[in-house]
Amino acid sequence: MFRAVSVGWKKYWWGTGVLPDRTNRVEDIYLRFYNGSTCEEYVDMPLDQAHRLFDIKGFEKNNPTVLYMHGFIETAQQESIQVMVSAYLESRPDTNVILIDWSNMAHGSYLVNAARNTKKVGAATAEQVHKLIDAGLPLDKLHLIGHSLGSHVAGYLARELKNKYRKTVKRVTALDPAFPAFYPDGVVMEHIVDKDAEFVDVIHTDAGGYGAPVRTGSADFWPNGGKSVQPGCPRFAPVPLSDDNLCSHWRSWRFYAESVRNPEAFPASPADSYHKFRENPSPEVGMVYMGANCDPSARGSYYLTTNAAPPFGKGMEGIYYKKKNKKATNGKNNMK
């Protein structure tokens, strides 16, 4: 096992080179527009042919548009993408859902290849999104969502639109943005920040592990404290990038997808720390919803608790932290 762990981390950082079927070129980034009611109905096109979207049946340019950016070593068939896309197609069918498939540049070495490619992918995508906006796509209805490395792709995309094309995105959602190589800021790459869009909301579920260790948005949400191990995830999962090892990191997109279907599933309470949240006698004061329907005026850190399995949302119960009072319990037992 320990040899597997060692080999796993070496592959994570240094990789095995670009995979044979991966070109590592921005010219081979694809857009996948889901034009049906399931994840199996879609149209793929090269990024530089984004203008074709306007001619595809099912694409309504005046409707809300979500651009989703996946994470490290993911492909278009990954569970995270299927879960996120299905939530929108089934619950919000009036939304244009588009995957930025940069899997050709998200493989190989994390440090040498994938992390450094986030800026290239963001810039290349921004150029095409800029053209779509000039052709009539409403900027105020554009929502960028990214998971892990995809969060930083979304940040670079929004930053490029703002700085180069003078177009400010209304909202970027970062789902447990990747930690290694991005924090502290500039250690290798620059990370997503609150100034990248009018509103940047962040969901932390593996802070200090695979995910960002600090606040990085306009509003940062810390379910169950925001760290590993999230409820329902294995406590011992030493093999890097295994499903068990990624469980807490993946909770971010599972929570968000659930919020698309149930916008009031995850009330969150403002607090300076998880400890203060647990001690707060009035957590409903300043409460906002984490996820799809988050109030864009929210600022600061917010906390909540979740269930260990779907449905993860507890509703209002999630902001009332229940303490185990062993003394009280023992006292009652002694009185019997």
Segments from the language model and where they lie:
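Flexible, membrane-associating and regulatory peripheral segments of lipid-active enzymes
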Residues: M1-L99, M105-N117, A126-L139, K164-K167, ...
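The conserved beta1-alpha1 loop
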Residues: M69-G71, H147, D176
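Active-site signature of alpha/beta-hydrolase-fold catalytic machinery across serine-
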Residues: V83, Y156-E160
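Alpha/beta-hydrolase fold nucleophile elbow
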Residues: G136-S148, V172
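Glycine-rich nucleophile elbow surrounding the catalytic serine of serine-hydrolase chemistry
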Residues: I145-L157
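Active-site nucleophile loop of the alpha/beta-hydrolase fold
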Residues: K170-A181, H204-A207, G226
